[in-house]
UniProtKB/Swiss-Prot annotation:
Similarity annotation: Belongs to the inositol monophosphatase superfamily.
Record protein name field: Inositol-1-monophosphatase
Enzyme's top EC category: hydrolase
SUPFAM superfamilies: Carbohydrate phosphatase
Domain of life: Bacteria
Amino acid sequence: MTSAQKPVFSPSDLQTWLEIATEAVLAAGAEIFSLWGKVQQIQEKGRAGDLVTEADRQAEAIILEIIKRRCPDHAILAEESGQLGQVDNPFCWAIDPLDGTTNFAHSYPVSCVSIGLLIQDIPTVGVVYNPFRQELFRAATSLGATLNRRPIQVSTTASLDKSLLVTGFAYDRVKTLDNNYPEFCYLTHLTQGVRRSGSAAIDLIDVACGRLDGYWERGINPWDMAAGIVIVREAGGIVSAYDCSPLDLSTGRILATNGKIHQELSQALAATPQWFQQYAAARAQKI
């Protein structure tokens, strides 16, 4: 997804791509909604708990048809189909046809369609649609962020102890000690609460529109976060690596906040190992 030659595009191009992504998420969202409660095929994709249904596949097929027809020269990175097109193409669509598949498979209505356009690996256009709440989030670099065509902004919460956060847990959480459990425990102590939706894209848009103040997670893929990153940034938030350095999509780690608690949340994540060691020792003495 890299290129030595800098791609050339205009604000009107961004608007066009935004409309293409919107067309695709709405069409896929309608398909997902029509299959609600009717899923018959649920499979695991090689990792325990990593599910795929016919809704994922059918929604992705709809999106791919639209993107390929409207942007035939662009590459695609889709959750179910993988990499399509040349790896070094500077324009690459990152597609999650159904983010929150496990929720969907259990008839828990917290899922969405997420489509982001990466330009030289930088999330530049993002659209997320939640068909169960009929919420359409859109953003493009320098064009702002909207919810159902109305501008949105991140929250104004200025301290971690007043914040409401959200996180998630990777599919390999049972097999690794780097599973986000200590961070979840520590941040629960430091904040007004930590939620878990089961959809990275929904977590990001909830930060973007001010429902939540911050989000962190490990073990996620570019298609999980590409669209949401643009939306958070255009809503006035900050997205980075855990240590506040520039985000690298390939690491699978992301920190996104309203900006006001960003440094404090980053410091808390860094302090987690020491806190958890002390907490575990103290708990062992009491049991």
